[in-house]
């Protein structure tokens, strides 16, 4: 069922403006609800579940088991200011971490590329990064770093390839000296004129050796000729922003998550032509943005996985998608903002981090989930930092390194900083920038752990609503135009239950201020707790939301009723109004047994002493 509001508006970059009214059933007393009603035969509760078949089906204790892992060597320590990503060299048995900190201004004047001991996490060397004019700043003659963000290690050629999201370039560093040996950066061009726009991730195709770079669009680089090609990105894509890639070796397909369009784009890895786009629909709320982030393709199992950030905690989690249609085959809720993802294909394990946000309360923030791809279950959580885990890397021994941006370590003194007025290196614990307020330099958490197989363990059998018979939560209705405000709704609500109002980007004005949402039932004639009209005030951070509303007690099966959703009561707000009719039906769900992973506390990483930073440019060989 699809509707369009009478007054269209411009969509913000975070997602399509939408409003949802969704049917939400609640179970009988003593039963357990799934965390979503995605039409999946697999897991649908936190941690993953394996449902039985048919109404009243039972699972024996011998059938209800899950893969058990032990977490060893979980440690954390002080890392780098502004650290972003990392890469592992099997040949060198070393970890490399990028750092790009804006500090007191938008330009970067704190930056390095660090070599790190993969076991102790001791920082062994920090590189001197090239300094260039800050052409984007209005103040003349200022300097900035060409700061590393994305990293991939090229052991065959003893190189570290890095992306720079500030000068929009890709560079190669000698892995032994940590000195730049090539760059795509053209000093005669401004940032928006560079060949590669907004580069982020960089990866090597193990078959051809060519490099894939995500950004605003998609690019390939021939490491021998240094030729840069733009992949056949879909024309007219709105707010595209490529994030991460995965390669299907058998089909030679490259999968790319696009955070801006809520899609996974599929390219021919050899011809670079666009083959299809997979729309990623929210497993909890279809009208709320999914914002796909990490991605992995398990070639041995033939499974395509993505991590989804969602919006304000909605839709966040681990998705298994049909590689041809994008249909959500399975969904496991995890965290407030699922982001960084690493894939150990040999062991059939995924590692997914909850980025969380320092301003938001999320019990899983800073957690990394250990996810078994054989059963689609989260089998363990490891808390590696207070929040904002940005990147995960699997090392040669199977251990996982987590790079966070949590700013835990205050008043950090570094010598990989430049004076922006001179471009000269200068040791400091306070960052200063002309015309800006000075800020203390803070460092982030660097952590490591290893998940070791420990056989199987008994799970817990719970009664859940059969996902196949549960009320459908939403109906996708967006027509994907840049100015259309759309609404989705169920055709039915259920007597004695609740329905959920959800939405995304209900804002007004150039500053995208949050609207106040007003809901009335039967033009105010039907009441809930004596109220015929309900107004929801959204916070500034609440770009997406859900609100539960009880079905009025006098609504009986077989009747038709309506709900009106509107905004515009706040001064300056845009006036929008829509009335939706639906039927009331009796709620009679089916229940099945489900095998779940027992609740368990996250393993805590232990703090280890920080060994300090070596002098910048030393110990690089």
Please give the residue ranges for each predicted region.
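Short, surface-exposed loop/turn segments at beta-strand-coil junctions that are enriched for proline
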Residues: 550-556
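Predominantly soluble domains enriched in secretory-pathway, periplasmic, or organellar proteins
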Residues: 31-477, 597, 617
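Exposed beta-strand face motif in extracellular beta-rich ectodomains
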Residues: 557-563
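Aromatic/hydrophobic beta-strand junction motif of beta-rich domains
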Residues: 501-505, 620
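Aromatic sugar-binding surface patches on proteins
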Residues: 539-548
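Secretory targeting and sorting signals
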Residues: 1-32, 621
């Amino acid at each position: 069922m699809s509707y369009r509001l009478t007054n269209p508006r411009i969509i913000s970059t975070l997602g399509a403006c939408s409003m949802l009214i969704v049917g939400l059933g609640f179970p009988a007393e003593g039963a357990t609800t799934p965390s979503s009603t995605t039409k999946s035969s697999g897991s649908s509760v936190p941690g993953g579940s394996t449902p039985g078949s048919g109404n009243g089906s039972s699972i024996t204790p011998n059938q209800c088991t899950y893969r058990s892992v032990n977490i060893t060597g979980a440690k954390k320590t002080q890392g780098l200011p502004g650290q972003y990503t990392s890469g592992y060299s099997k040949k060198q048995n070393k970890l490399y971490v990028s750092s790009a900190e804006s500090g007191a201004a938008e330009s970067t004047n704190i930056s390095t590329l660090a070599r790190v001991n993969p076991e102790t996490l001791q920082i062994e060397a920090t590189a001197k990064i090239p300094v260039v004019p800050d052409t984007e700043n209005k103040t003349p003659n200022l300097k900035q770093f060409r700061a590393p963000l994305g990293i991939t290690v090229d052991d065959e050629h003893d190189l570290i390839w890095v992306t720079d999201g500030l000068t929009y370039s890709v560079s190669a560093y000698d892995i032994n000296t940590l000195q730049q040996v090539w760059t795509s950066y053209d000093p005669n061009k401004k940032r928006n004129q560079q060949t590669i726009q907004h580069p982020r991730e960089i990866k090597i195709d193990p078959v051809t050796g060519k490099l894939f770079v995500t950004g605003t669009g998609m690019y390939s680089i021939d490491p021998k000729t240094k030729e840069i090609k733009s992949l056949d990105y879909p024309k007219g894509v709105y707010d595209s922003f490529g994030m991460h890639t995965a390669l299907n070796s058998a089909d030679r397909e490259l999968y790319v998550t696009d955070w801006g369009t809520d899609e996974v784009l599929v390219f021919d890895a050899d011809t670079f032509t666009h083959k299809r786009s997979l729309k990623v629909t929210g497993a909890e709320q279809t009208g709320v943005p999914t914002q796909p982030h990490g991605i992995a393709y398990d070639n041995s199992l033939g499974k395509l996985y993505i991590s989804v950030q969602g919006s304000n905690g909605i839709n966040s989690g681990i998705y298994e998608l049909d590689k041809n249609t994008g249909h959500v085959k399975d969904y496991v809720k995890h965290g407030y903002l699922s982001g960084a993802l690493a894939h150990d294909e040999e062991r059939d394990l995924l590692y997914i981090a909850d980025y969380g946000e320092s301003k938001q309360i999320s019990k899983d923030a800073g957690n990394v989930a250990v996810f078994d791809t054989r059963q689609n279950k989260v089998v363990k959580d490891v808390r590696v930092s207070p929040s904002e885990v940005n990147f995960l890397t699997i090392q040669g021994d199977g251990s996982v390194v987590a790079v966070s941006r949590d700013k835990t370590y205050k008043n950090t003194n570094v010598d990989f900083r430049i004076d922006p007025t001179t471009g000269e290196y200068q040791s400091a614990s306070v960052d200063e920038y002309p015309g800006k307020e000075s800020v203390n330099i803070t460092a982030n958490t660097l952590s490591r752990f290893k998940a070791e197989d420990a056989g199987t363990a008994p799970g817990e059998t719970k009664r859940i609503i059969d996902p196949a018979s549960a009320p459908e939560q939403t109906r996708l209705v967006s027509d994907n135009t840049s100015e259309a405000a759309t609404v989705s709704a169920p055709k039915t609500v259920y007597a004695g239950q609740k329905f959920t109002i959800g939405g995304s980007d209900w804002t007004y004005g150039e500053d995208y201020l949050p609207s106040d949402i007003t809901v009335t039932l039967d033009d105010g004639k039907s009441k809930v707790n004596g109220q015929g009209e309900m107004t929801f005030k959204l916070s500034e951070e609440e770009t997406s939301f859900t609100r539960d509303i009880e079905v009025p007690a006098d609504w009986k099966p077989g009747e038709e009723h309506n709900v009106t959703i509107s905004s515009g009561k706040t001064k300056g707000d845009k006036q929008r109004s829509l009335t939706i009719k639906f039927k009331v039906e009796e709620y009679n769900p089916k229940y099945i047994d489900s095998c779940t992973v027992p609740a368990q506390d996250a393993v805590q990483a232990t703090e280890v002493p920080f060994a300090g930073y070596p002098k910048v440019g030393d110990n690089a060989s």
